[in-house]
Each structure stands twice: as C-alpha cells, then as structure tokens.
Amino acid sequence: MDRRSSLRLIGGTVAGATLGGIWRGARAARPETRPDILVVVVDDLRWDEFGAGGHPYLKTPNIDRLAREGVSFTRAMHATPLCSPNRACILTGQYTARHCIYNNEDRSLLSHLLPTFPQELQRSGYTTGLVGKWHMGNDPTPRPGFDYWVSFQGQGKILDPELYEDGRLQKVPGYVTDLLTDRALGFIRRQRNSQRPYFLYLAHKAVHPDAIQHNDGSFDLAYGTHYIAAERHRGRYRNEIFPRSQIAKTAEQGALGSVMVQRFLARKNAESTVREFGDILDPGMAEQSIRDRAEMILSVDEGLGAILSELEESGRLGATAIVLTSDNGFFFGEHGLSVERRLPYEESIRNPLLVRFPRAISAGMRVNELVSSIDIAPSILELAGANIGGQIQGASFLPLLAHGAARRVRRSSVLIENYSDDRPFPWVLDADYRAIRTDRQKLIHWIQHPEFDELYDLTTDPREERNVIKEPANHGLVERLRSDLGKLVQHSISL
C-alpha cells in the first residue's frame, strides 16, 4: 500500500457517500451549510470517567447527552498517551515520531511551527479560537491558526490563574474551569451574527492536578500536586467508594503480567524515591484522589451544559459539531500504577471520544472499530469541507458513521508510541516503547528492553494480567504482529 493510500485508507474512495461529502466544496455554497465546530479536550480524563462511560457514582448529564445524542467511539486510542505529545497528535493529525513533540519539556519554539488543522480551517474561511491549555511549552502567546487566543503558561493554575488574553498575561480571580467556560461562551456569542462558521478548541485544565512544571519537564516538588474541585462541588462525593473488584489489591499483583512494570515499581517504591517525591507518587490510587477528580469533572460538565444551552438559545445547536476527547487516561491502581499515564495499558491509552452532530450522526451510535487520536484532525477537516494535506497521517473516521454500503472498516490496528525522558518520573526513564493494538491483541515492544516484550489477549484477559508472549502456541501470532508493527512504524516516520 502506498503512502497516499495508507493515509486515506478508504476515506477517499467513499467521499461522495460519507458525511464529509455533504460539505465538500462548501466554500462556494451558503455559509450556513458549513458546521460550526467545537472541540473540548479534558485533561487526563479516562475513557470511563463519566456517567455514560461507566463511572460508578460520577454524574455528568451534559457529557452523557453527547453520548446519548451522538456517537461513542468505544475503541478510540491515544497515539501517545501523554499530555504534550498527544495534544500535538490531535492538532496535527501526525504521529509523535513525525511532529517531534516527544515529551512534556518546553517545546515552545517548535510548537509555533506545527502544521495544525486550525490553520487550514482558518484558510478555508473559519473564524478560529483557542481557550485553555496549549501545554506544548510554557510560552502562553498565540500560536498560528487562531484568531482568538486565551491560554496560560504550561500547566496553568486551578485557582486565580494567570491568563494570557488581550496581548498580556494577567492574574484573574476565580476557578479556572469556570473562567475558561466564560471565555468560550463569549467567543461563541460573538459569532452569532457572523456569516462565517467558527471553530473553537476548548482545552480544560481539569482534571489534571495543580502542579508547577519547569521547562525541563520536571515538577516543583515543594509545591506538590493537588486536585482542587470548585468550592461548590467539594465534598459532593465524600462518602463514595470506587469499586476495587477489578483492580489488583497490591502493586505486586498488578505487575504480574509485566517485567517492565515490576522494574518501574521497584524503583518507584525505593526509599530514595519515596523520600524525594512524597505524595506525588500515588494520587490515582488514593480513594480521596478519585473522589477529588470526580468533583473536578463536575465543573467541566456544568460548563458544557452552559455551552449547550447557549447554542440551543441561539438556534445553532443542530448546526454545531461537538467533539469531546482527552489527551491521555490515568491509572486508579491498575497494574499497581497511578501517575504513569504514558504506559501502554488500556486505562491510559483508551480515549473517551464522543461526537455530536445531529445533522448527520444518528443518536446513540456506538462505533467499535479502532480509531486513533491522529484521526481527529482529518475528520474535522473533512467535516468542514477543508483541505486535508498530505502531511496528515491520520484518516477521517467519518466513513465509520455512514450507513449501508458506504460504511467501511478503516483499519485493523493502531500504533501507540512513547519516547521517555523522563525528568518528572525517573522510575520510568526507560519506558520507550512502540505497541500495536488490534481488536483482540496488544503487542508491546520495549525499545531498550526487547527481552521483556509483552503480548495480551484482550478478549480473554481484558485487564492485561497475563503476558502470553512466550507461549509456543503464540509464536506465529507474535511474528505477524511484529511485522504489522514494523509497517505502522515505517508509516509513522515516512515523509
């Protein structure tokens, strides 16, 4: 398969029958035929960390509404399950090996040069805005492709943050989720009488804990990390318990399938590491942290509700495509892990991808085919009738939303990769890997330690507790997956 074919897979062959075909050539048509587009990115949100996703006590009626009235992608994956790299994957449609935002170090200069899809939307006639977390460098100034820009330095702060808006950085009193929602609403309201469609990228600080991250990617250990819910939500879930029946009770039990995880945990639990990092080590495993995260998400859900109400009041809800996603998942003790969100296990790589657009998407759809975060960019460009450049490595998922003969299965596997540094968490310093995830299997290749590669049958072992790579019966399967992984890697680095 040549590169152009592999980029598009089947998207181009059914363009006339897919959703994107509705708006192809729309620049010559009436402006209202092109949808307004809202992308909401929730930081660190697990694929199951909202009501409709299966959370046992968190109530998220507005996020659930997107799922109920739109499509849920049940096998969407993060191309690199880590903050900065995956944000670049989402915005460029490229793998990390191509866009080169490898980790959370300060990539300010490089991030000014990224070929992002909002630039193409802007060229095609959209008014574009970014509100919230850029997090590809600590430079808060505007990046190319956005007419409106409100952001902050690096991780930002939860309470009384410094926001860069109107050309300067200034401290603004309030809770960051509410402040970002207010600015998103302001942008949307200013477009009410515009003849141009708009695109808004709303990237929340939540549900990431408060933290200070230096230019080299390391955290300010004296400051620590803190989950802080809006005052009105604190204590809402104080008596709730997250069920642990499907989570290993100890780190040792959780690491049984992986020699690499056992190595990571041995370093993490070393006396010197505990002494240096303190309470940063295990926020995801603490019951209170899981409650605090749930309470933080409540303000995100309320903000989404306010936006939905504004769109309904203006009569634009039906003409607005809304995408909700995250940059990576998180561990609640699975495999004995918590903050090691970059590792290639299901809790971290699965993406809570929802899309609502009633003009073209049937309510309550569930798409079980594999989708990657690099597919978001070409999907939005196709939806907008804009050009999908050859630099984009993802493929539009719109063909998966078509019906009948137009519907196609796009890919049989996805690539997941990580390039570790790692100053924030030195116990995973050698966690560089490339992994292939199919409908049924996952093969993990540890770049520095191939002798510890892993294979899981996700149908019989969904919690990835039994590494079966050395079982003789799997020899042929391992060789096939290695070959397929090699092809994906070749595509990821191709020009």
Feature locations, PLM:
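Formylglycine-dependent sulfatase
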Residues: 2-447, 451-454, 462-483, 487-495
